[in-house]
Amino acid sequence: MRVLISNDDGVFAEGIRTLAAAAVARGHDVTVVCPDQERSATGHGLTLQTPIRAERADELFVPGVTAWACSGTPADCMKLALFELVKDKPDLVLSGINHGPNLGTDVFCSGTVAAAMEGTLEGIPSMAISSACFQWRQFQAGAELAVEVAEQALADQWPENLLLNLNIPPCNRDAMGPLRWTRLSIRRYDEQFSSRVDPRGRAYYWLAGEVVNDLESAGEGPRDWPSDVAQIHANSPSLTPIQPDLFWRGSLSGLPQLKLKDQLVR
């Protein structure tokens, strides 16, 4: 199987190298196209004002991996891979393993999820994989689980337009609880910015919010599914189905009436 892998932590990150090695160990044909440096929290941004460069980086990975380090964002990397660098269309896109969680509504700013979403938009089964702790640096168990889940999802006829978002708790495989389907949590933060003053007396800001640990809040989905945050809190891997269609799924009668002299027709 042809597997294309990217991330947002960059080509030197241990997570992506472990994931690529796990896919090779399962007998897959692996290509990596990922940022040449840290590109975390870049969301689905694209590079439009400067050229994008790509250099071979095979030596950073296990034998059998074809690798490119790209100057762009994770979404750039995936587009460049699919339309320029990779000869044959991949059977599977994997993005990760991210060095930190991608839970709940944080997926909207995640470069890891954006790379997987690019694959989804191009009709390729795609999965984002994240280690749900910034300090945890043992990726082997998560990499093996991710490849196993992806292989089984493909065998089960992976639906079109489905992106799988896998978060893995910070523990060894034998200490993990069971994998479960989960809903996206609603993520909120306290004290979003840290304000400081430079030597010339001008204010500047660091984005430095602390996440509110809410195990209950979650969006749409079956009520008997836990939130992804609650699942990770239980030391169990979470698997959340995501789709690119953001159309409002609430009641249409609840939409604003917008009485603008018949300018809005419904």
Curated annotation (Swiss-Prot):
Cellular component per GO, a single term: cytoplasm
Manganese recorded as keyword: no
Enzyme class of the recorded protein, top EC level: hydrolase
Compartments where found: Cytoplasm
Required cofactor names: a divalent metal cation
Principal cellular location given in the protein's record: cytoplasm
Presence of the UniProt keyword Flavoprotein in the record: no
Cofactor note: Binds 1 divalent metal cation per subunit.
EC code: 3.1.3.5
Known catalytic reactions: a ribonucleoside 5'-phosphate + H2O = a ribonucleoside + phosphate
InterPro entries reported in the protein's UniProt record: SurE, SurE-like_Pase/nucleotidase, SurE-like_sf
Function: Nucleotidase that shows phosphatase activity on nucleoside 5'-monophosphates.
Similarity section: Belongs to the SurE nucleotidase family.
Protein name from the UniProt record: 5'-nucleotidase SurE
The organism's taxonomic lineage, starting at the top: Bacteria, Bacillati, Cyanobacteriota, Cyanophyceae, Synechococcales
